[in-house]
């Protein structure tokens, strides 16, 4: 799988500067998506290796391949391919008619996607402090460049600069944590660190105190750095500005792919902490380090649930609203991760998978709305948002007024995605939240369960606000008058553009998964159950 990604990466590095004038950026994206799909198939094929159950160390122990890491690698690469396949804006007829209405495609986009995918897959299997830091930086640097690819857009460049500066701060925290752990233990491999601290903790209190403070503080710094990168509250302030400033096609990547790799890495780190750090105590208290780690995740979970829901109520820009929605979902993921039982890990994996698919489908639908609206009404959609160089982006919720009448299937698909995010039965999002809440109540976290239920009810209001705008609000006729008075070219009704067949197939397939999951839930649920058991019994 890594070999396939490396071959694709090297091929693009050579092809983009040599053939960029003869090969369109869309073709580069299609080639990259094929590489990602083939790599995902290779990853899934590796699940048949029996020795993966207990894990296999590769590259001198820098990476530790397990069943969970291989399965999530395949899912991550497959999800990345879905996002890339949604790039093709409209039909070739519209592209030939005018190039001003099409998203400005950039050949380097596919190259940055491969760099990010490479870093994410390496992070999933990292078992060493060095490989962990290099993997997260490979993923992060590519994402920083990805956020600023649209250098002619003031909002995109400012968002990318903010992302780079604050992301560098989180990387510095992670590096400081690794330095503390290495200075107190002299080791970089996670398994060796777990074993050393467990052995020294059983000798005497004096020997244990030598390692406890530094190692625990180092772990806390690493955890805070990763929570910063997944936009967990109260370290979330950068996320709404960045997600709203960059183009939608980039936002769809930022909100999904980096989070998958980081959350699964935290899952494997959590399993190691549970098994080997029970004897480690803080120098300023009697709580064990696993309790401190769990409290860190629980505090971030509660704050993410509350802030992501309450602040999202006042948003009128759709990508900022979805950013706060993402923060709220991060709270559910952290809650399931902190409980760390078989049931909670199963719910964690299931929630991560369903949220990724639902989130990707939501942004694919927003892209489709933007493509169709910008070409079917006028070439001056930037009048709605003059600061955006990307004229096909949906910036405001009000831009979706009356779209159910214009595009009923897209409107229905978006409504189903929003209902799933709100946790309305019988959609897939309901079962994900139900599993997290069941595991939290079964583990005795009743207060957190009540908070999660309340914020789920409250968050449904801003999802319903979008649905109300799509279904019941009428379009503003003054907008058409402004476009006409500007003497712009308006497309005739018989010349209305459509999205590509691949784009529509992706939307319909993901929507069917969201809706029809209830008819055959055992496929995904059994897979998550087996992955969760592999962490506890191997």
Swiss-Prot record:
It comes from the Eukaryota. The chain crosses the membrane at residues 1-21, 33-53, 70-90, 102-122, 129-149, 163-183, 215-235, 249-269, 296-316, 321-341, 348-368, 412-432, 447-467, 505-525. This is NADH-ubiquinone oxidoreductase chain 2. Its EC number is 7.1.1.2. Belongs to the complex I subunit 2 family. The keyword NADP does not apply. It is found in: Mitochondrion inner membrane. GO terms for cellular component: mitochondrial inner membrane.
């Amino acid at each position: 799988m890594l070999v396939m990604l490396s071959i694709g990466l090297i091929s693009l590095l050579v092809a983009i500067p040599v053939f960029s004038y003869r090969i369109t950026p869309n073709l580069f994206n299609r080639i990259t998506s094929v590489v990602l799909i083939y790599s995902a198939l290779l990853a899934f094929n590796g699940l048949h290796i029996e020795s993966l159950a207990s894990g296999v160390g590769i590259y001198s122990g820098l990476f530790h391949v397990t069943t969970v890491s291989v399965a999530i690698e395949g899912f991550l690469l497959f999800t990345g391919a879905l996002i890339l396949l949604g790039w093709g804006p409209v039909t070739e007829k519209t592209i030939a008619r005018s190039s001003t209405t099409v998203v400005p495609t950039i050949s380097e986009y596919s190259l940055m996607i491969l760099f990010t995918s490479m870093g994410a897959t390496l992070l999933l299997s990292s078992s060493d402090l060095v490989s962990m830091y290099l993997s997260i930086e490979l993923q992060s640097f590519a994402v920083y460049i990805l956020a600023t690819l649209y250098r002619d857009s003031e909002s995109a460049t400012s968002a990318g600069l903010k992302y780079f500066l604050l992301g560098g701060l989180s990387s510095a925290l992670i590096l400081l944590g690794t330095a503390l752990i290495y200075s107190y233990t002299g080791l970089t491999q996670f398994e060796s660190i777990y074993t050393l601290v467990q052995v020294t903790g059983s000798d005497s209190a004096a020997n244990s105190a030598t390692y406890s403070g530094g190692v625990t503080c180092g772990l806390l710094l690493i955890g805070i750095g990763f929570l910063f990168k997944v936009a967990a509250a109260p370290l979330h302030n950068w996320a709404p500005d960045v997600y709203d400033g960059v183009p939608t096609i980039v936002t769809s990547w930022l909100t999904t792919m980096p989070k998958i790799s980081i959350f699964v890495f935290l899952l494997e780190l959590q399993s190691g902490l549970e098994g080997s750090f029970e004897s480690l105590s803080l120098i300023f208290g009697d709580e064990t380090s696993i309790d401190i780690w769990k409290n860190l995740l629980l505090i971030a979970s509660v704050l993410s649930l509350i802030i992501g829901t309450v602040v999202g109520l006042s948003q009128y820009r759709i990508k900022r609203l979805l950013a706060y929605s993402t923060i709220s979902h991060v709270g559910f993921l952290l809650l399931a991760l902190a409980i760390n039982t078989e049931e909670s890990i199963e719910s964690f994996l299931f929630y991560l998978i369903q949220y990724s698919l639902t989130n990707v489908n939501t942004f694919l639908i927003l892209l489709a709305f933007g493509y169709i609206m910008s070409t079917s009404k006028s070439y001056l959609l930037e009048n709605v948002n003059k600061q955006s160089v990307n004229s096909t982006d949906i910036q405001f919720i009000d831009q979706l007024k009356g779209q159910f009448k214009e595009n009923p299937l897209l409107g229905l698909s978006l409504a189903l995605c929003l209902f799933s995010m709100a946790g309305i039965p019988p959609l897939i999002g309901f079962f994900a939240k139900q599993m997290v809440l069941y595991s939290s109540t079964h583990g005795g976290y009743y207060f957190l369960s009540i908070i999660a239920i309340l914020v789920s009810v409250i968050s449904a209001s801003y999802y319903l606000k979008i649905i109300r705008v799509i279904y019941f609000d009428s379009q503003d006729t003054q907008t058409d008058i402004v476009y006409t008075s500007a003497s712009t070219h308006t497309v005739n009704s018989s010349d209305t553009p459509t999205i590509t067949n691949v784009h529509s197939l992706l939307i319909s397939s993901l929507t069917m998964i969201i809706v029809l999951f209830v008819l055959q839930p055992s496929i995904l649920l059994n897979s998550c159950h087996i992955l969760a058991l592999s962490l506890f019994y191997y």
